[in-house]
Amino acid sequence: MVNISIIGAGSVAFSMSFIRDLCVTESLWGSKVTLMDISKDRLNMIHNLTVRYMKETKANLKIETTTNRKDALDDAEFVLCTVKVGGYQPMETEREIAERHGYYRGIGDRVCDYYGGFGAYHQLKFFLELARDMEDLCPDAWLIETANPVFEGTTLISRETKIKTIGVCHGHFGYKKMAKTLGLSLKDVNVEVAGFNHCVWMTHFLYKGRDAYPLLDEWIEEKAEKYWKSEEFLKGLPWETEQMSPAAVDMYKQFGLFPIGDTVRSASPWWYHTDLETKKRWFGPTGGFDSEIGWSIYLKYRESRLKRMQSIYSDPSASLTKEFPPVMSGEQHIPIIDSIANDKEKILQLNIPNKNSISGIPDDVVVEIPAVVSGRGVQGIHVGTLPKRLMLYVMIPRMMRMEQILQAFKEGDRKSLILALMEDPRTKSYEQARSLVDELLAQPWNAEAARHYR
């Protein structure tokens, strides 16, 4: 029986995965779950759906709601954060502005990082405020961070506060798509995935206890071209086809380990992304998740999902367990809580400070690695050395971009934002970078950021 707070619970589809997992985890029944969101409408929706789901599954949980973050944190033992400050529309406008300045599909992770907003300012500020509130109201609680940018955010929190912080993502499950494409039975597949959030690589791949990288090599040599002409690849959703795309295979050839999940798009070389036709060659007919085609498909998918949630919310007779079958969702948040609260040892894929797990990465940089979770806490598993080329051309540059973002944020340094953008191969002059930074910071939703970055 524990106190769990979900900050940003109005993200209904995501929050329902937490509720679903809580309702089927009987060892956590009796827990208090506080749903917090600044939107009363969304809060009412998730509360309604939660109560109905509990009734259908006969789960025993105490549910409270609030629009006040500090009330939600009072005496919490586990805090789940899913907040995206300001929503997604400002980011779409920022992308359009960047394109006018010569940056096709926006400036990516070189300044704003993965869905962080420009300079990640609003997200990082919120993360730090949340952690400071936790130091006052629930200093012994665990913060389970899901909101992006996870890499920058968890590194910042772990350095600047005393809060126990875990970053969680589901991108590493991309290995399942790989195994399925290779025709392997998942129950006989064992992988180790390591790196940074959205930049993870398959360091070990076993099938029935034997090294399975040769099976991947064989597929690439004999079957990849046929697969890329198949209906499964050509007509699949962009976020489902990336894992076994030409981009993924080429990254493996370039850097020595196979990229997993979001890595295929967010850590891939710039020359895969110069224009739509180039993206199509590497990612398939849509150009991948981040192209104008792929992103439009995703936004329509999100909209249809929200409409579906609203329809179920408006229909008291609709079955929640039909929409969300009462089995574990696959997300790791509730298993983390169950492991720590009830001392059930599990190995999970988490973002935690390195502490010598990956060689060549400082101890205070958060890495995404397998970790042992139990009542004793969280202990990362030693990964060791990554290929030198991967370290030099991907890992260290990505780590330095994280450091640039955090330095600019902590010091309010506008010039650092410009200098970070100067490293983008699309930047032709200092004036181009400076004018883009100035225009982005001039947007009304960035007024506070403009004052911060002097």
State where each predicted segment sits.
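N-terminal Rossmann-like dinucleotide-binding module
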Residues: 2-29
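NAD(P)-binding Rossmann-fold cofactor-contacting core
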Residues: 27-51
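Hydrophobic or amphipathic alpha-helical targeting/insertion segments
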Residues: 75-83
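Internal, well-ordered domain-core segments that constitute the primary functional module
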Residues: 130-214
